[in-house]
């Protein structure tokens, strides 16, 4: 784990014009751990890409393996057809953690964690990498589950396209604090405070057509009712990485 | 409210190559009500824009007035400097509503609501429109609150830039149902079901420096503990529209 090890990735992503934070430097960082923690707490990301000068912002499920990001969709989708040759993309994850009501309009804010990742998105066409992605898209979220499923058919494999992108640059941005008013405003008789926001899991709704006696699988324990989705996804990522 | 009224906006956004759904047509629509409902339930969006061929995907707070979308940031921000001349943008909102575990990898899915809006983003430089935005950025989320705040200073107004974009095309996409397995897979002894996901508000954390006797304002009632953020934001939008 020493950063002196020749093969260890450096602690920070390289900083270029693409990912350099242009404002609120106090909220930002470039280190891998911060970026990965924000990514691993999410299932949904937004990917920006360009077709003929027109930007598109597409929401999609994604997952991370080291510095690789993967997402998937039908080979018919607009984005994927255009990505075949490899195209610059920006994948962003954001978590809204709180509403911040201040004593002035200017100091109203939100608590959040976000990560922006830059790279070149490419279709995964290597058969081994694609087979691994077919398992990962299930097992990253539900560790061990792919072994228990009905095996993939050849037709399903053909109809599935995965996109892979190595993170070339990235940045993380976090606001996680209370009201930050101008010093003289604290004396005003105006209410200020934070409303926390949390994304939580509800009671599982089993499929009404379950075969009698089929018990909930162990991976469902990660997503028990009342837990944060964040926590469940982060724990699932760790379990997935440990194999 | 009749669609025969000459001045009423048509029920659907025009369909062009930009917003035409390329897959899962069964989940999509182009009607204003569906798109607006998804937007109005959110505070956070992701905006895609392009600088020198490089796509950026930026998370930001936003709000809607009719078919106009607004978001804001420091005039120093990368996005805004490049948007001054007006630039194509795509603003997307997504809500994750559930994890869908099926009997095959292929039928794993998520419940979600998303809206993609296309248009030309421009700096709001008309003084009246900017003054209105200064109030709206507070009042859309906290109806009536801007009147109770310490007034904006000239320096704050100068340091604030708003972006406006009229929605030229848009689409909505929704998955809101249970497991959809292949018919023959329902006979398999594999667990399947849905884990609902909800974004909820926590107990308010008042600023520790509140002046004695300052009571929580009425607009905070929209964001009471245990309520969905969705619901609070949707109700706030209605209150804001009713003035």
Name each model-derived stretch.
Chain A
Residues 1-22, 66-76, 112-121, 240-242:
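N-terminal short leaders/motifs
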Residues 1-19, 129-243:
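C-terminal edge-of-domain segments
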Residues 5-10, 75-136:
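Short, structured beta-strand-loop surface elements
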Residues 13-70, 81:
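An N-terminal domain-cap segment
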Residues 43, 67, 85-89, 113-117, ...:
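A generic structural signal for short beta-strands and their flanking turns/coil linkers
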Residues 62, 119-121, 163, 167:
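A structural signal for short, well-ordered beta-strand segments
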Residues 68-70, 90, 173:
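General beta-strand recognition
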């Amino acid at each position: 784990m020493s950063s002196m090890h020749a093969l260890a990735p450096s602690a920070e992503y390289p900083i270029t014009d693409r990912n350099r934070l242009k404002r609120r430097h106090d909220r930002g960082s470039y280190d891998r751990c911060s970026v990965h923690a924000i990514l691993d707490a999410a299932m949904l990301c937004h990917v920006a890409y360009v077709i003929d000068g027109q930007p598109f912002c597409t929401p999609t499920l994604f997952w991370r393996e080291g510095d690789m990001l993967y997402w998937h969709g039908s080979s018919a989708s607009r984005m994927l057809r255009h990505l075949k040759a490899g195209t610059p993309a920006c994948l962003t994850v954001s978590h809204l953690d709180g509403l911040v009501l201040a004593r002035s309009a200017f100091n109203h804010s939100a608590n959040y964690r976000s990560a922006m990742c830059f790279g070149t998105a490419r279709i995964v066409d290597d058969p081994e990498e694609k087979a691994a992605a077919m398992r990962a898209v299930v097992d990253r979220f539900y560790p061990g589950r792919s072994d228990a499923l009905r095996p993939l058919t050849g037709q399903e494999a053909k109809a599935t396209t995965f996109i892979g992108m190595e993170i070339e640059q990235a940045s993380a941005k976090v606001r996680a604090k209370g009201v930050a008013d101008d010093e003289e405003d604290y004396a005003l008789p105006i209410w200020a405070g934070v409303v926390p926001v949390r994304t939580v899991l509800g009671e599982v709704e089993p499929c009404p057509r379950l075969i009698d006696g089929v018990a909930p699988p162990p991976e469902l324990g990660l997503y028990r009712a009342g837990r944060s989705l964040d926590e469940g996804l982060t724990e699932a990522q760790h379990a997935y990485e440990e194999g």
